[in-house]
Amino acid sequence: MAPHETNETFAVFDGHLIRKVVPRRGQPYEHRCPRPSLERVAHAIDELGDEGFTIHSIAEREDLPSTQVAVALAFLRERGIIETHYRHGYAATQVGVHLDAMTEYHALAENG
């Protein structure tokens, strides 16, 4: 593992998407994103279409905490639904982000 890489895993518990991170240096941490927030992020991406976005632009647009948006975007990126676009931005890899996001969320909830 390179110096700045992390071990990142996702789980679903009690209606929340949980992102657990174990950095190579520092303390492990976790952040949560309620399912309704994940849905709002996914719908916002669908509405943006081909337009790129950042954590902060989605957080501001949807009036959500940036940590919840960061969890949602990390999950969508890990599942191949969005990709990194330039240094701090993202772009959808396909149409139907909400449908794919909910499919992946429920699969994770059922299968771990």
Ranges and model annotations:
Residues 1-36:
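Long, low-complexity, charged/polar intrinsically disordered regions in eukaryotic proteins
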Residues 32, 52, 63-67:
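Intrinsic disorder
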Residues 35-51:
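Short helix->loop/beta-hairpin flanking segments within DNA-binding domains
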Residues 48-61:
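Short acidic, hydrophobic short linear motifs in intrinsically disordered regions
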Residues 63-78:
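Short amphipathic alpha-helical interaction segments
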Residues 77-88:
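A short, conserved structural fragment
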Residues 88-95:
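Minor-groove-contacting beta-hairpin "wing" of winged helix-turn-helix DNA-binding domains
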Residues 95-112:
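Short, amphipathic alpha-helical interaction segments positioned at domain boundaries
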